[in-house]
Amino acid sequence: MLVHRMKLLTASAGILLFAIIFGWVLFPQILKFMISKQVTLKPGTDIRDLWSATPFPLHFYIYIFNVTNPEEVAEGGKPRVQEIGPFVFDEWKDKYDLVDDVVEDTVSYNMRNTFIFNEKASSPLTGEEIITLPHPLLQSIGITVQRERAAMMEMVAKALAIVFPDAKPFLTAKFMDLFFRGIDVDCSSDEFAAKALCTVFYTGEVKQAKQVNQTHFLFSFLGQANHSDAGRFTVCRGVKNNKKLGKVVKFADEPEMDMWPGDECNRFVGTDSTVFAPGMKQEAGLWAFTPDICRSLGAIYQRKTTYHGMPALRYTLDLGDVRLDEKLHCFCDDPENLETCPPKGTMNLAPCVGGPLIASMPHFLNGDPKLIQDVDGLHPNEKEHAVFIDFELMSGTPFQAAKRLQFNLDVEPVQGIEPLRHLRKLIMPMFWVEEGVQLNKTYTNMVKYTLFLGLKFNSGLRWTLITLSLVGFMSAGYLFYQKSDSLDITVPPNIIRESNKVANAPKPDRQQQPKAHLVPLPGVNLSNPKVEHRDRY
C-alpha cells in the first residue's frame, strides 16, 4: 500500500511539472520558432508572394470639404464647408524590380499603387460632382513666394494672371478632374514672367503635374500617384533576424532622409506598412515609414479586442504635439523656436511637398481647438476619424486597419496678388482619405488554423494534465489519510508463540487451591472488625 501511494504521488507531481514546463515554456517557444521560420521574405515562401503582390484590393476612400461660401471667404469671411463622400476606390498594391541581397539579408523593390474607381461602393456619387476647393496652384504658389521669395512677388503675380486668367481663390471643378484626370495648366505664353513660372512644371518640381505636350500640363491631386512608382525601398527580409522583418533600411537608395533639421526626424523607423515582424512586444508599438509625408509614424497599444472570434490588440495613432517632445522639435521650422512649430494635432508638409500643406487627423480630431473654431462644418469623432489597427502580435498579422489623414492648406493673405489679399489666416481643410483593409475568412483562417488551434490545443492539454495531477494528489492524500486512521500493528512471531502457550496452558481447579491463611496484625481482632471513621482534612 505504501509503495502504491508513493507512486501515485510521484506520478501526479510529474504530470503537474510537465504541464507547467510544456504548456507555459516549451510550447510557446516551439510555436514562435515555427512562425519565425515561416514568416520571412525569403523567395519562394507564401509570405513573400503575398507581400510582393497583395492578392486583394484595399479600400481607399476620399472625402471632400466642399466650400459653400467661396465669395464670402475671398472677402475675409469665415469658411463654411460641407463634407461630400466617400468616393470609393479599389487600391491594388504591388512591388516590382525585386533584388535580393543574401549577405545583407535585404530586398530592394519599387512600390506601386493603382486606384480603380468603384462605382457600386461610391453610389450615389459618380465622380462627376462639381466641388469647390481652395485653388491648389494659385494659393500655393502665391503663399510660397510671399514666404520664401518676396522680392519676386511682382513678376509671379503677373505670371499667375497669364497662366491662370480670371483665377479666383477657390476653384470649382469636377471631382475626377481635380483628383485624377487633371485641370489644364497653359504654359504656351511667350511672356518672360509666364515662362519663368512654368519652369517649375518643366523641371518636375510640381510633382502633381503631368506634361501632355510641349506647352500644356495637367494638374491633379492623385493622378500622378496612380499606377506609378511610389519610391524604391530596401527592407530586411527577416531570414537571419526575424525581429527585423520588413524594417526599412533605405529609401531612394539613402539610409536616412535629408528633409528635416534633425537626425531623429530623418530616421526611418518601422516597416513600409505592408508587413510586420512576428512576436513583437506590445509596448513597442507599430511603426511604419510613409513617403507621402516624409515621416515615420507609430501606433500605440490601446486595448484588447477580437476579430472574427480571434483575440487581437488594438493600436491607435495620433499626431500629438511636437512642442511637448524635444526629440520631435526637428519638425518645427526652427527647432530653437517653438513658436515655429505646427499646432497640436498637425504636421507641416512644406519641406516634403514644397508647398504650404498641413497634415492632420480628419476634422482636426485631437487637434488644437482653434483649428475647428476657424471653420464651420467640422465634426470630429473617434469612431469615424481615428486611425486604428487590430493586430495579432505572435504572427504579426494585421486583421483590420483604417489609416486616415487629412490634407489642409496653410492659408494666409497675399498682398501682392489681388484675389488673395483679403483671405483670413487659417488652416483650411481640403479633403481627407482613408486606406482600409479587413481580412476575409480566407486569410483569417490561415492564422486561425496555424496559430490559434495550436494555442487552443496547448491550453486544453495543459489544463487537462493539471486536472489529472490534482486528482492524483487528492487520491494520494485520501489514501494517506486512511492509513493514519487505521494503523496496522505488526507483532513479532516469538511474542505470538509465547502468547499462544500461555493461552493454551491448563487452568488449575479452584477447589484444589489451598486456602490462604490470614495472619492477624498485632492488636487486631479479626472476629470483631470495626469500621473506623476519620475526618479527612
From Swiss-Prot:
Disulfide bonds join C265-C330, C294-C352, C332-C341. Residues 29-459 are extracellular. It is a multi-pass membrane protein. The keyword Membrane applies. One of its GO terms (molecular function) is scavenger receptor activity. Its main location: membrane. InterPro entries: CD36_fam (IPR002159). Residues 1-7, 481-537 are cytoplasmic. Residues 503-537 are annotated as: Disordered. The keyword Transmembrane helix applies. GO terms for biological process: cell surface receptor signaling pathway; cellular response to pheromone; detection of chemical stimulus involved in sensory perception of smell; lipid homeostasis; pupariation. The chain crosses the membrane at residues 8-28, 460-480. One of its GO terms (cellular component) is plasma membrane. Keywords: Cell membrane, Disulfide bond, Glycoprotein, Membrane, Olfaction, Receptor, Sensory transduction, Transmembrane, Transmembrane helix. It is found in: Cell membrane. Glycans are attached at N66, N213, N226, N440. Pfam families: CD36. Plays an olfactory role that is not restricted to pheromone sensitivity. Belongs to the CD36 family. This is Sensory neuron membrane protein 1. It comes from Drosophila virilis.
